[in-house]
Amino acid sequence: MEAALRKLISAALLAASVLVLSAAGFAQAPPAPDPEKPYVMEYYYKTHWGHQEEFLDLFKKNHYPVLQTEIAAGRILSVRMDTPAYHMPEQERWDYRVTIVFKNAQAAFTPIDEHAIQLKLFPDQATFKREEQHRFEILEAHWDLAMSQIALDKK
């Protein structure tokens, strides 16, 4: 009886494993980015409570000018920042979402000399570095999402 039960459990575990692995094969991969189309990245920032405005001020002072330089160079098409209109549960909370639309995927992933841009924009590097370090110290979490658009009208 015990041997039969073990065989039954083993068979059930094997069947469950096969189903799980088969289902993973059916999961649809995101579409590959079109090299000719704009590429969207979203950056989420969650600050420590009470530091939302301070983070926003430092972002606008020290990081947004770098992004504007990249817009002027044609690498980035647009930059937008959003904040939730209502509160969320703490675990899911984020304070700011920055959406950057790059010219294309290559522009998004080709490294640039951001340090050269920062040197040109911020001659007082000691202050700039201190403020940027503080901007990240007041963050509780930060994550990036590459977005893939799905054409709903295609079959």
Regions of interest found by a model, annotated:
Residues 28, 40-41, 80-85:
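Short structured motifs
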Residues 11-22:
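Bacterial N-terminal signal peptides
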Residues 1-7:
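N-terminal secretory signal peptides that target proteins for export/translocation
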